[in-house]
């Protein structure tokens, strides 16, 4: 797995998810397996099979999260001093079609959440913004065609 950028906040969120899977979910599943064993014949025990499937799924999630954490490149965005857009930037854009301002923060792919205006570094809009400065006009290609934005402000602050 290649290294990937992530904010400190995103890294801690993945750590918390891993702890929950290891110390809460795993314990619950182990208890469910023990309880299901008491029902008798394991070859026809649906509860046992379901609990074992949940155990496999949980173990896979744990493995995946451990790999993500091992390959994460934590970026402390408040220490970035730049007037151009890079990973971690909070940008204020003016949509040239609607004349409405929109604010996005560019984050890693595992912490993106459009409902919180957190966009992945791999997204088309983030890719169009990388390297740009306040005052630049950018075009983002969407399935409905090009969309133009004016970059009003670039900041490096926590979200």
Swiss-Prot record:
Q: Drop me one GO molecular function for this one.
A: RNA polymerase binding
Upper lineage: Bacteria, Pseudomonadati, Pseudomonadota, Alphaproteobacteria, Rickettsiales
Keywords recorded for this protein, A-Z: DNA-binding, Transcription, Transcription regulation
What protein name does the entry list? Answer: Transcription elongation factor GreA
Record family assignment: Belongs to the GreA/GreB family.
Name the Gene3D superfamilies on file: Transcription elongation factor, GreA/GreB, C-terminal domain (3.10.50.30), Transcription elongation factor, GreA/GreB, N-terminal domain (1.10.287.180)
Q: Which GO terms describe its biological process?
A: DNA-templated transcription elongation; regulation of DNA-templated transcription elongation
The reply on keyword Iron-sulfur is no
Specify one Pfam family.
GreA_GreB
The free-text function statement in the UniProt record for this protein reads: Necessary for efficient RNA polymerase transcription elongation past template-encoded arresting sites. The arresting sites in DNA have the property of trapping a certain fraction of elongating RNA polymerases that pass through, resulting in locked ternary complexes. Cleavage of the nascent transcript by cleavage factors such as GreA or GreB allows the resumption of elongation from the new 3'terminus. GreA releases sequences of 2 to 3 nucleotides.
């Amino acid at each position: 797995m290649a290294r990937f950028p992530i904010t400190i906040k995103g890294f801690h969120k993945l750590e918390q998810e891993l702890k929950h899977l290891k110390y809460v979910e795993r314990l619950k599943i182990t208890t469910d397996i023990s309880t299901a064993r008491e029902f008798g014949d394991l070859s026809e025990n649906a509860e046992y099979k379901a609990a074992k499937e949940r155990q496999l799924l949980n173990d896979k999630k744990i493995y995946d999260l451990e790999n993500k954490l091992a390959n994460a490149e934590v970026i402390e965005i408040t220490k970035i001093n730049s007037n151009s857009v890079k990973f971690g930037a909070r940008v204020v854009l003016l949509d040239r079609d609607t004349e409405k301002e929109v604010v996005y923060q560019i984050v890693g792919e595992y912490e993106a959440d459009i409902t919180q205006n957190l966009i992945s570094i791999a997204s088309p809009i983030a890719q169009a913004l990388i390297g740009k400065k306040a005052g630049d006009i950018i075009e983002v290609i969407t399935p409905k065609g090009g969309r133009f934005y004016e970059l009003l402000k670039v900041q490096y602050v926590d979200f």
